[in-house]
């Protein structure tokens, strides 16, 4: 098996020549230049991804949901029982959760992956990549060893690349795990340098009178574990969780194939921050689906330099926002491939010349 360093070195650069050709093509379509706004920019971004061979298109779609428990749940940072992780993972196998319904609407397959659920036996119907029965309590110890983090990254990268070989061209990331907004906030605080109180939110409806404890837990975790903000693996291993590592692996795996990844909400932003520390080359492959309602969302997205396409006041997680945004990707591909051209209709708009239209 390749090492993580070897895999990171395989991530291709975006093709600027393909993007320039796409820009000229889009400017010559039956519309005023720029009138389809961010949809045009999205099509151009897709055209630059080597895995799509210069033509924006969508083949198979997949949302990969990483499921794991967190030792930090013991610190009272979540109101949901820890057992809900396993219950909801099982519900995902029945197709009844939010992400499953939205993914079905978008024509995407949901891959439910156990990377660290705290049950005695594996849950039937889940893809088993379990590292342990939940991560360590980051308030008193590292979430996991560096070796565990690297192995899980490699496993997920390889799984993602295999899906790409089988025709998946659009990936979405999601997660499931009680208390996981706490390690996500710790990652965001560590990498952005912002104080815990600026990035810690209520997660799954944590009462406001418990928020101070959650902020304190994040601060203690960072102080105790001393994650290196320049080392994405170190941050994930010390103050992250198996679900966050898994999402980072999907991003790295898809980017290594030159393919796009739709982010979800706050948890995925945290994973993206860590993944980009491992390989800044993945950033052009990341597409932000929606603006999470979680407190630190804007801070994380600003650090990533990303602007979401939707603002639906969602904070469910699971990959729900990624699934919801998949039709936007398909719309960008549709305008690129199916609209008529100005030149064919003998239309010359101000700012366009005949040579422009025929180039």
UniProtKB/Swiss-Prot annotation:
Coiled coil: none annotated. SUPFAM superfamilies: Nicotinate mononucleotide:5,6-dimethylbenzimidazole phosphoribosyltransferase (CobT) (SSF52733). It catalyses: 5,6-dimethylbenzimidazole + nicotinate beta-D-ribonucleotide = alpha-ribazole 5'-phosphate + nicotinate + H(+). Pathway: Nucleoside biosynthesis; alpha-ribazole biosynthesis; alpha-ribazole from 5,6-dimethylbenzimidazole: step 1/2. It holds the Pfam family DBI_PRT. It is an enzyme of class 2 (transferase). Keywords: Cobalamin biosynthesis, Glycosyltransferase, Transferase. GO terms for biological process: cobalamin biosynthetic process. The active site is at residue 318. GO terms for molecular function: nicotinate-nucleotide-dimethylbenzimidazole phosphoribosyltransferase activity. Its EC number is 2.4.2.21. Homodimer. Belongs to the CobT family. Catalyzes the synthesis of alpha-ribazole-5'-phosphate from nicotinate mononucleotide (NAMN) and 5,6-dimethylbenzimidazole (DMB). This is Nicotinate-nucleotide--dimethylbenzimidazole phosphoribosyltransferase.
